[in-house]
Regions:
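Alpha-helical/coil-rich non-catalytic "connector" segments in signaling and regulatory proteins
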Residues: 1-193
Length: 193
């Protein structure tokens, strides 16, 4: 609460999250610590709950990154990496090369969709899928943003993140994370990239 603010000359580095009536914070301009002020609409419980949600999210990202890093250097190949990533995200992942051949399809989580079942059997993106990619300029959008592109497929009626795969700055394929089992959290696009 702003009722219990420390002295401005407190000689310690920390971040203080506070709520309550607004003060003249200019007296803290030269302080060693940082103040995050949330206004009067926040309560102590709301501030605590928000902080816990953010810390939990950070912990999940850190744990997921650790698992992905281990999978990357495990020597077990692309399929193992894709399966590990799929377990972390809780959604299916597909990797294709630039000739529309599936290089890896995550095991375990399979969307209940005839289109994906047929494509998985053939090992290639179907003509219908290629036509949709071209009509929606999906390849161009992925290259333009240099970041995962969110796309809702009219063929599977669900969203997906699509990102380019580069090896030594050369695009060699695309990776797709389907939003079929769990909705994407705000951090997913950055983590997926």
């Amino acid at each position: 609460s702003t009722d219990t603010m420390p002295a401005a000359n407190t000689n310690a580095e920390f971040t203080l999250m506070c709520f309550g009536e607004r003060l003249d914070f200019s007296v803290y301009d030269q302080s060693c610590f940082t103040i995050l002020y949330f206004g009067t609409s926040f309560s102590q419980a709301a501030l605590f709950n928000t902080a816990m949600e953010l810390l939990t999210e950070i912990q999940q990202i850190t744990a997921g990154m650790h698992l992905l890093l281990n999978a990357s250097f495990s020597g077990k190949g692309l399929q193992y990496l894709v399966d590990t990533a799929s377990r972390i995200f809780g959604n299916p992942i597909y990797v294709v090369d630039l000739q529309n051949k599936y290089l890896a399809i995550s095991a375990g989580i399979v969307p209940d969709n005839d289109f994906f079942r047929e494509e998985s059997k053939s090992g290639y993106i179907s003509k219908q899928g290629i036509a949709s990619i071209r009509a929606n300029h999906l390849d161009e959008m992925v290259r333009k943003y240099n970041h995962p592109y969110y796309y809702t497929s009219e063929l599977v009626h669900t969203g997906m993140l699509v990102d380019a795969i580069h090896i030594q700055n050369i695009e060699v394929g695309h990776v797709m994370l389907l939003e079929s089992e769990h909705p994407f959290e705000d951090y997913v696009p950055d983590f997926f990239h």
